[in-house]
Amino acid sequence: FASQENMAKWLPLPLYFGGSEHNTMHLLYSRFITKALRSLNLVDFSEPFLGRRNHGFIFGPDGQKMSKSRGNVVDPDEQVSKYGADTMRMYFAFMGPYDQNYAFNFDGVLGVRRFLDRFWNFVQNHTNKKLKIADNPKINLVLNKSVKEIGEQIKQHKFNTGVSGLMKLLNALDKLVGSDGKLETVNHEMIVKLIAPYAPHMAEELWMEVLGNKTSVHLE
């Protein structure tokens, strides 16, 4: 029927993502087929997925379902061209809980764009390859706390609170390092790794071009 080795490696899948309409469509079909295969002793599991997460929907700026007739359609290609793919990716993550519905908000997009600009400038302005990482207990405390919290939020699919955590981290580092940079440089590699899942393109450029690493941040 199928490679036992491959089935043991890949199945059952850890998580199924989709809209609520999948509950009576693809999810239902896959569960039915899996149970049939189980009854024939062709697989040794009864459920194809170990978990299920519904995603929400994004409506037009007017709070209504996007429609050409309503004139409220937001062209994703146009937004990416204007603000960048990382901005849109982080904006969608920041809108709120993953399973809720939201109206598209242009001011929210601009807010995320400004944050990414601040993040980029912070890493550039406080990077000095001749200096060692500042051994500052306050900075280390903030960084370690953020790594733990944001990492857990990503695992729990609380992407919006993860972005909020990054914003709080940048605000805290701005205050601790100061505009004159007297605290030398902070562990930029750590904060670039933290932002990489949300802004992969910017993180890669900072990682390689500014911080001088030779391999991708996404391989770390």
How should each PLM-predicted stretch be described?
Residues 1-98:
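Alpha-helical recognition segments enriched in aromatics with Gly/Pro capping
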Residues 28, 45-46, 78-220:
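Helix-rich, typically C-terminal accessory recognition domains appended to large enzymatic cores
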